[in-house]
Amino acid sequence: MEKLEQKTIVELRNVTKSYGDKTILKDLNLTINDGEFLTILGPSGCGKTTALRLIAGFEDLTEGSIILDGQDVSNVSAEKRPVNTVFQSYALFPHMTIFENVAFGLRMQKVPNEQITPRVMEALRMVRLEDRAEQKPAQLSGGQQQRIAIARAVVNKPKVLLLDESLSALDYKLRKEMQNELKALQRQLGITFIFVTHDQEEALTMSDRIIVMNAGKVAQDGTPREIYEEPKNLFVARFIGEINVFDATVIERIDARNVKANVEGRICHIKVEDMQVVPNQKLKVLLRPEDIVIEELDEDQSSKAIIGHIIDRNYKGMTLESSVKLDHNGMNVLVSEFFNEDDPHIDHSVGQKVALTWHEGWEVVLNDEDC
């Protein structure tokens, strides 16, 4: 079946934003497709919120242009752009009922009164709060207030919904529930969601696509699986979850995709795909904690694996995390295993000598200069 070409709804072309002599975004190019859930992810100060505010029209561009649904809106005011924003604080009017909060934007647009009630109630039904229409925001929980803020944003039928750290004020359990609700609502509405967060788990859970930003630039653009399993640089690898970074030296090429290498003393095959490598070249081998296999050894026992000793353990319910200090260089390696209380080989002791291996092909390999 032929894949349908996706329609572009938002495009940032060579966008630069500076405050005085401080540049926050530099030549940012970004294409966002109609109907997708896109997350802009990055640490504080990376420029993600600035990018969102530029799309919304709350900030003026220094250079570049912003295209919304085929129209250049670079000089169009915020209230005339076909987007709505949900803020971290929700910004609900405490003196108004839920109905009037949701109806506020429609009244500002001078929508006829006979259209307001059905549109407001439709929006409230979408977030399953139609029975709370006559209550005040203070009578609702944090999660319910979040849903009202979303209802108020979608009642105007925007082409794009912008969400700025919108779940960060919620407790962990409620945040997890809202992640699922937001994604379900986005599918139901079929409109583009652009979500800004520093929370990697939120991004991986909800997104169709993730833009990882660092220092005002795109560090990687990909699906959640690509971002987690195939990081293109060390910044992305370390920002998205835990990762172990090993030094490696190429010994010889085995075939088009694999080389024999010395990885922290372990001689093994690693996949380099289409990388151009030569003998004695330095590489970085990246492995997630869950990809490493740990085997207990007696103190006098030798192994061709990477050798270390357990210095700490953390029980996490479904998993057991072990911190291993490598014997040859003192590096700490994190290993995560599914916990099985009936398996005596899982519940390791602090001080235990261990051998570390992994299934060849599970590693990510980067050039040393990429790190």
Curated annotation (Swiss-Prot):
It comes from the Bacteria. It is a peripheral membrane protein. Part of the ABC transporter complex PotABCD involved in spermidine/putrescine import. Responsible for energy coupling to the transport system. ATP binds at residues 42-49. GO terms for cellular component: ATP-binding cassette (ABC) transporter complex. InterPro entries: AAA+_ATPase, ABC_SmlMolc_Importer, ABC_transporter-like_ATP-bd, ABC_transporter-like_CS, Mo/tungstate-bd_C_term_dom, P-loop_NTPase, PotA-like, PotA_ATP-bd. SUPFAM superfamilies: MOP-like, P-loop containing nucleoside triphosphate hydrolases. The gene is potA. It is found in: Cell inner membrane. This is Spermidine/putrescine import ATP-binding protein PotA. One of its GO terms (molecular function) is ATP binding. Its main location: membrane. Signal peptide: none annotated. It catalyses: ATP + H2O + polyamine-[polyamine-binding protein]Side 1 = ADP + phosphate + polyamineSide 2 + [polyamine-binding protein]Side 1. Belongs to the ABC transporter superfamily. Spermidine/putrescine importer (TC 3.A.1.11.1) family. Its EC number is 7.6.2.11. The complex is composed of two ATP-binding proteins (PotA), two transmembrane proteins (PotB and PotC) and a solute-binding protein (PotD). Residues 10-240 form the ABC transporter domain. NCBIfam families: potA, PRK09452.1. Keywords: ATP-binding, Cell inner membrane, Cell membrane, Membrane, Nucleotide-binding, Translocase, Transport. It is an enzyme of class 7 (translocase).
